[in-house]
């Protein structure tokens, strides 16, 4: 096979891979949107409006290199505070640079007094967050104090991993499952006047046409985020304009192929260039937007390899010129000149000139994602890609289980208020009923919310019904559910498997020792009690074993058989669903098995014990964070 044929083969495989990957991401998009909506119901605090930003809501096709975690981006807007883009209002943005990118937020004495007595806002606009400006008769909002106050008042639960930096807008951290990038912000009352060229420069038949730009101008807000300009004397007092919402609209306007190729470009950039520490993905994203706007290319038919090579040339030119123009602000160069060194320039030039390196990077991606083998694979071996991709019949199960988990958790939190709990239940049932995937949750949710037993029993309804009865100490109902389905160890391919959720609210006297052991060990690992999902059939088998332990009528032989069956089934469970790693069905099941081992040893019950796989020994750094969108 010659080089041209090999490239065609690689392009065809990449196109099939991206289409399959993207279609699955779009399938679960509404599930994830509802997940976020439910979570926002829990964290809805009067002074804060929570926005999602970043690659997920931009609908980039997400592909993460190994060991690179996919974080979740939140923008926390302070409600009922709008900053004037110019003028002398009670609170206004005063640019400190000609391009309007950076500036300070100035507040009048009268407006300051009103903020500090407002019931919801006084905890954000504190004495320490406002200092008298020596250049004007006003107060300056102190960015770092503002950021900390907003995060504290938002109620967002996560562990901060870094101290806030004056040059960065976010307060990064991590939750039990994912990394978080949290950005407090304030809304501008209008787009800056420095955006007039962006509004008018679109061509009628271009991707970003003029009529679309006018709609974005009206519908998408511009925020101010706490970030200072390198080497500026005002650095610790500065905010900068953020166009994260218009950027989301740009991605919505892109042709599907280009949106998918953005994800591929991000993978290649992260894999090859992120360690150099020069340009960030933010710079590359704007270069890509400029490519789409300026270059006369048929974006609906460009090949993946050609797209990447074109981008590489654009990055090389940008580094040589020291120029990355802001996509929205006029005459605003955001090139990171302070990071420029000979070594970094040389590394970029060498890597971006080596097109074979990019090709090998793409082949490595396909090997990792599709073949799961370390052997050398040529492009010709990637034929029949679609047949290697898993069926999507049960693809959404993990995402539905995650959604069910957060719904149950928030419902448990609101149960203290009957009115709030009823309102929450009605809203969730309505939202779940509109999508073909989330509709699968309705029967189970009615079981939780209303106690409605479905007419047609399934593994899911039996397991969740048994769990609710079990946590109330009603073993008769549990045994009835178990006897109807526990003997069936296989489920039809088209069945949706919804895990049983275990949370900190289930730490009641009815919670047995093995389940409590699993929760305790995971809490030790993560510093908080995570929401745990048990495979429904595993839970039913567990209940049978618990019932046998309580009665002990049949001697040790029956107990030994049930424990052996539970252990054998746990080995067949997925280590990747509903999360990869320590919150997977398999890992949680192994922890329950360890809990049984501890119990049997302490009670001197003489039955065979089972060693579980070493990766659930929690001293190993195995995290459940999303590293890539799993096709395996």
Swiss-Prot record:
Residues engaged in binding Mg(2+): 71, 73, 181
The keyword Nucleotidyltransferase appears for this protein: yes
Keywords linked to the UniProt accession: Immunity, Innate immunity, Magnesium, Manganese, Metal-binding, Nucleotidyltransferase, Transferase
Pfam families the UniProt entry points to: Mab-21_C
Classification via InterPro entries: Mab-21_HhH/H2TH-like, MAB21L/cGLR
Entry EC no(s): 2.7.7.-
Swiss-Prot/TrEMBL GO biological process terms: innate immune response
Cofactor or coenzyme needed: Mg(2+); Mn(2+)
Top-level taxon of origin: Eukaryota
Keyword Magnesium: yes
Residues binding Mn(2+), per UniProt: 295
Enzyme class: transferase
Any GO molecular function: nucleotidyltransferase activity
Family: Belongs to the mab-21 family.
Function: Nucleotidyltransferase that catalyzes the formation of some cyclic nucleotide and plays a key role in innate immunity. Directly binds some unknown ligand, activating the nucleotidyltransferase activity, leading to synthesis of a second messenger that binds to and activates Sting, thereby triggering the immune response via activation of the NF-kappa-B transcription factor.
Protein name: Cyclic GMP-AMP synthase-like receptor 2
Species annotation: Crassostrea virginica
């Amino acid at each position: 096979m010659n080089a041209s044929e090999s490239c065609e083969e690689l392009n065809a495989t990449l196109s099939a891979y991206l289409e399959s990957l993207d279609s699955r991401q779009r399938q679960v998009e509404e599930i994830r949107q509802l997940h976020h909506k439910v979570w926002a119901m829990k964290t809805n605090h009067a002074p804060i409006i929570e926005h999602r930003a970043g690659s997920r809501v931009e609908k980039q096709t997400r592909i993460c290199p190994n060991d690179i975690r996919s974080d979740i981006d939140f923008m926390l807007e302070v409600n009922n505070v709008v900053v004037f883009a110019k003028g002398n209002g009670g609170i206004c943005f005063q640019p400190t640079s000609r391009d309007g990118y950076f500036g300070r937020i100035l507040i009048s004495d009268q407006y300051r007094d009103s903020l500090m007595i407002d019931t919801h806002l006084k905890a954000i606009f504190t004495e320490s967050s406002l200092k008298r400006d020596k250049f004007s008769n006003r107060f300056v909002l102190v960015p770092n104090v503002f950021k900390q106050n907003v995060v504290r008042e938002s109620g967002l639960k996560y562990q901060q991993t870094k101290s806030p930096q004056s040059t960065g807008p976010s307060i990064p951290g991590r939750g039990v499952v994912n990394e978080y990038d949290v950005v407090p912000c304030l809304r501008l009352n209008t787009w800056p006047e420095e955006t007039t060229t962006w509004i008018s420069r679109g061509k009628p038949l271009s991707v970003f046409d003029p009529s679309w730009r006018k709609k974005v101008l009206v519908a998408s807000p511009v925020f101010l985020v706490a970030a200072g300009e390198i080497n500026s004397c005002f650095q610790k007092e500065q905010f900068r304009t953020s166009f994260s919402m218009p950027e989301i609209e740009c991605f919505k306007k892109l042709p599907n192929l280009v949106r998918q190729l953005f994800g591929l470009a991000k993978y290649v950039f992260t894999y090859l260039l992120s360690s150099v520490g020069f340009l960030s993905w933010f710079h590359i994203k704007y270069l890509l937007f400029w490519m789409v706007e300026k270059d006369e290319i048929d974006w609906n038919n460009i090949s993946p390899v050609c797209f990447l090579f074109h981008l590489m040339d654009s990055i090389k030119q940008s580094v040589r010129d020291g120029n990355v123009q802001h996509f929205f602000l006029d005459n605003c160069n955001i090139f990171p000149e302070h990071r420029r060194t000979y070594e970094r320039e040389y590394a970029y030039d060498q890597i971006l000139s080596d097109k074979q390196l990019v090709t090998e990077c793409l082949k490595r991606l396909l090997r990792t994602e599709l073949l799961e083998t370390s052997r050398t694979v040529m492009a010709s071996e990637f034929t029949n890609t679609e047949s290697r991709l898993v069926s999507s019949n049960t693809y959404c199960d993990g995402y539905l289980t995650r959604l069910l988990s957060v719904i149950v958790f928030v419902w448990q939190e609101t149960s203290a208020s009957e009115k709030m709990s009823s309102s929450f239940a009605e809203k969730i049932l309505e939202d779940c009923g509109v999508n073909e995937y989330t509709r699968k949750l309705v029967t189970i949710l009615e079981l939780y919310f209303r106690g409605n037993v479905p007419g047609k029993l399934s593994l899911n309804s039996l397991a969740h019904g048994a769990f609710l009865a079990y946590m109330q100490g009603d073993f008769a109902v549990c045994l009835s559910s178990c006897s109807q389905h526990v003997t069936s160890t296989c489920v039809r391919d088209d069945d949706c498997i919804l895990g049983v959720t275990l949370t900190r609210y289930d730490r009641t006297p009815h919670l047995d020792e093995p389940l409590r052991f699993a929760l305790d060990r995971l809490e030790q690992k993560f510093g908080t009690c995570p929401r745990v999902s048990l495979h429904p059939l595993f839970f039913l088998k567990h209940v049978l074993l618990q019932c046998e332990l309580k009665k002990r009528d049949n001697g040790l032989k029956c107990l030994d058989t049930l424990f052996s069956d539970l252990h054998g089934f746990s080995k067949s469970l997925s280590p990747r669903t509903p999360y990869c790693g320590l919150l997977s069905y398999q890992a949680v099941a192994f922890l329950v098995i360890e809990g049984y081992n501890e119990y049997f040893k302490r009670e001197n019950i003489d039955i065979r014990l089972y060693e579980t796989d070493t990766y659930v020994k929690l001293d190993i750094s195995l995290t459940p964070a999303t590293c890539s969108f799993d096709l395996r």
